[in-house]
Amino acid sequence: MNSSILTGIFGGSFDPPHEGHSEILKSFFLEVPDCKEVFVIPNRQNPLKEEKISLSENILEMLNLFVSEFSQSIRILDLELKRSGPSYTIQTIQELKTIYPNRKFVLLIGEDNYSNFHKWKDWEKILTEVETIFVFRRFSKEVPLNSHLNSLFEFKFLENPLIPVTSTDLRKSFFQSKVPNLISKKVLDYILKNKLYSK
């Protein structure tokens, strides 16, 4: 590999960040030791999912608390939060390549996004902009292979632990006045202190 810094891109709502996200990052750093840094990029609005609940400043503060527990280099970028309207991965990748011309990027996506990758804006262009796409497990012990996608590009599959939690589930628990598990104490304390996800 040349002198370019290999950097991961990990996007999502992170509303709130939880132990599932933590295990994905741990597995990624373990399985991809050449990667020296991950950019965690919260989106303002995913075009294929429901609109977010929390304010951008709350998301960023929760993420700062979340990544403070890692020894590896993880940087939070707010470029998608600053956009109006939906966030598109192709825009983000191209913007990052302009800002960081000496880096090579790999993308982390969930198995659900892998299944729907053909629905992403300019998905074929994304394949030309990153080195590799790593798919993490969310629900399946073994991610069903998309033969067509894998004939076009190298998708690699992480062996991350399956953590039965989503940000949507956590928000529902808070709305029902239940304090959920699978969320770090720092993030939980922040949520309770600031009355996020309360009725």
UniProtKB/Swiss-Prot annotation:
Q: Signal sequence span per UniProt?
A: none
Q: Which domain of life is it from?
A: Bacteria
Q: Which gene encodes it?
A: nadD
Which residues are connected by disulfide bridges in this protein? none
Name of the protein: Probable nicotinate-nucleotide adenylyltransferase
Q: Which Pfam families match?
A: CTP_transf_like
Residue ranges that the Swiss-Prot or TrEMBL entry lists as coiled coil: none
User: What does this protein's UniProt record list under function?
Assistant: Catalyzes the reversible adenylation of nicotinate mononucleotide (NaMN) to nicotinic acid adenine dinucleotide (NaAD).
Supply the enzyme class, top level.
Answer: transferase
Q: Which reaction does it catalyse?
A: nicotinate beta-D-ribonucleotide + ATP + H(+) = deamido-NAD(+) + diphosphate
Q: Which PANTHER family does this chain map to?
A: NICOTINATE-NUCLEOTIDE ADENYLYLTRANSFERASE-RELATED (PTHR39321), PHOSPHOPANTETHEINE ADENYLYLTRANSFERASE (PTHR39321:SF3)
